[in-house]
Amino acid sequence: MRIYDLIAKKRDGGTHSREELETIVNGYVSGDVTDYQMAAWMMAVYLRGMTDEETAELTDVMAHSGVMVDLSPIPGIKVDKHSTGGVGDKTTLVIVPIVAACGVKIAKMSGRGLGHTGGTIDKMESVPGTKTALSQEEFFAQVNKIGLSVIGQSEGIAIADKKMYALRDVTATVSCIPLIASSIMSKKLASGSDAILLDVTTGTGAFIKTVEQSIELAKLMVSIGTHHGRRVAAMITDMDTPLGHNIGNSLEVMESMDVLKGRGPADLTEVCLQLATNMLVLADKGTPAECRAMAEAVIADGSAFAKCKEMFAAQGGDTRVLDDYSLFEQPAARYELLAEQNGYIVENDAEKIGSASVLLGAGRQKKGDPLDFAAGITLHKKRGDYVHKGESLATFYGVADKFEAAAEEYRSGLVYGAEQPAETPLVYALVTKDGVEHY
């Protein structure tokens, strides 16, 4: 069937066979299908949708467009975690050592930041000397020896997704649920883990803005994973407000270490404990209550922090900075952002905060941009807090000539009010193959 006919079929609301999806996806990877044809087909998917079975087949075709990682040399159940992204989303650096300290093997591939959201690999590389590009042999050997490793995603994984994502980004088809689900799950299936916990963020700082849409996406991804024989669960977490107080690479590492030392912010600690609990449940470590107790215990006895240091040391990192934060690269300058009036912070748009941190140099506006590891923002006041005029809302770190533009961006997402806004939950729901449990 010609690509023209396949575009027309989806435009008219038809359902594709696996063979047709292979023609589209593999043709795009090989260059037989052009960008403009793929863009037309993806817009047809955006407007007409896909059945769950069709999306599961698309995911598998995308996964098989590149390397399929075989984790069988690592014994036991391997559990992975994926976040759909957010501002100040530093949970991976906390939960991976917690779960590994409880005896579960973690062989995780993570990404870099793009747009207003940060990436785990960038954060890890702010620890001097840390290597995130390991060979497969080094990766497996480290996981077998110490129980965990987090590395950058291989260029060879889900090749179709890389091309399709870049095209979606410039054709207004990013927020299409079947295309988001197949993008995420193709990488997860190709990465080889037995069980996957998805952290589906929702709100202003996330790509999906409503709880209802986030649940729809989570159900579809759980269905895809189950269809392919993986254990999958998804938590719907709030991203209207950044987790914790720090946004920026080394700043987020410091805050993550504080959680592992038992002195982190309450919101970040709670979300990390819930994520770790569900990963342990997927790994058959016990009931939710037993797994929660295990996660709390490895923070309390210091073994989770020790496991984190062990991982950084194995990957060449200078672990002294994890104990003494003054050894991190220091910012060139700092700036206090002051409240312009009295009142409650009714809105503090997380996407605007993330964009402000990018302007400071903590993130990338385009692929390949250099990062300032010391740049970022520390929040002193968050949504729901009362502030007095002249009080510090946040401290900016970076190069002085970037402060004005970042402050303008930050303030554009700030709304004051006379009434304290209602509190939003940290976690909205847990989605499994058995259904949706609302919190």
Residue ranges and their predicted role:
Residues 144-193:
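Phosphate/diphosphate-binding glycine-rich loops and adjacent basic-rich segments that engage nucleotide
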Residues 5, 17, 28, 68-69, ...:
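Well-ordered secondary-structure scaffolds
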Residues 47, 93-105, 187-192, 224-228, ...:
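Alpha-helix C-terminal capping segments
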Residues 1-88, 307-318, 433-434, 439:
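Acidic, glycine/proline-rich low-complexity segments that act as flexible tails and inter-domain linkers
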Residues 123-149, 219-225, 229:
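A glycine-rich helix N-cap at a beta->alpha junction
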Residues 77-100, 104-116:
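Glycine/serine-rich anion-binding loops at beta->alpha junctions
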Residues 106-110, 132-135, 150-153, 197-200, ...:
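General beta-strand structural signal in soluble alpha/beta enzymes
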Residues 3-5, 120, 161-169, 202:
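Gly-rich Lys/Arg/Thr-decorated short loops/hinges at beta-loop-alpha junctions or inter-strand turns
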